[in-house]
């Protein structure tokens, strides 16, 4: 699906010292990718994505740095390491910062145990470990814990767990008796393993930040998606933002406010079991409108697809789905590509296999948002300046 993206007034260009990065062609095509020169601006057409970038495969153009005053690899105390969960995103972050990814050896023994060895010194360094705990969640979580432990034993000054997608985030409270609160347990594990800070993107609920006994920087992917939607030049009179459930109303309301204070509609549903949802009613008017459905994640797509079907029944002209985290558990792909949606807009917090691409899918990159946040944390700068104040960084 081709998209022509024009500059948008929604988020003005950041007045930061950056130079652009040029992405060369690749066999994997993303309908849209973030322009590394500006976290809020995009390149139209088919910008390239990369399956895996290593020291031997990184294009020469990626050697350009984020800053006019280059970060010198041999003198900086900033180190970025990637786990095996999302090396593409980690490479994009390091390219934005003008750094090479740290050298690390990660392997599985025959019995499935995880082995991690840092292959360069991190003594006295600010270390950032990029590892979403996406499926397989248990494997990726354990790998992150072992990476943190390795950095602590190697005398790193500070260790920040960069978790673009925080697994177990939905288990943040008891819904029935004698249940665990797994989100709190995972927070304890990360803290006790030796992390000094967590950088997470679009947590399922705000209270999850309180589960940690260490600082948490909460980065929102919302500005990236908003800027892309603003570039589509849809009349504000035709827009309506839809929350797929009552729990997402606050998120959808904030989203609508940024889109020219668009009206809000709510899909009222009742869940009869895990990953099973039933649409009950629509609160609001969508007749003849372009409906923008907003959620923090899409798992099996049951909630959002049934909501989209209801919106069409109620007379919506077009339906867009917007989410930060594309978990895409079966049968999500078949539901999302069934024709209910004009476009499905996601970010790259979770790696997406090539077989899961479909024509309506658009992928945006959050690498620059995470890279800028990492730099500000390392440089002891506040993120609470416009437009970074929209990211919720303190």
UniProtKB/Swiss-Prot annotation:
Alphabetically ordered keywords of this record: ATP-binding, Chloroplast, Kinase, Magnesium, Metal-binding, Nucleotide biosynthesis, Nucleotide-binding, Plastid, Transferase, Transit peptide
CDD domains: PRTases_typeI
One GO BP annotation of this record: ribonucleoside monophosphate biosynthetic process
Transit peptide, residue positions per record: 1-33
Taxonomy, superkingdom: Eukaryota
GO molecular function: ATP binding; kinase activity; magnesium ion binding; ribose phosphate diphosphokinase activity
Chief place of localization: plastid
Keyword Transit peptide tagged: yes
Binding of phosphoribosylpyrophosphate, as annotated region: 288-303
Compartments where located: Plastid, Chloroplast
EC numbers: 2.7.6.1
EC primary class: transferase
GO-annotated cellular components: chloroplast; plastid
Pfam families: Pribosyl_synth, Pribosyltran_N
Positions with a binding annotation for Mg(2+): 202, 204, 213, 217
Reaction catalysed by this enzyme: D-ribose 5-phosphate + ATP = 5-phospho-alpha-D-ribose 1-diphosphate + AMP + H(+)
Presence of the UniProt keyword Plastid in the record: yes
Family: Belongs to the ribose-phosphate pyrophosphokinase family.
Protein name (database record): Ribose-phosphate pyrophosphokinase 5, chloroplastic
Lineage: Eukaryota, Viridiplantae, Streptophyta, Embryophyta, Tracheophyta
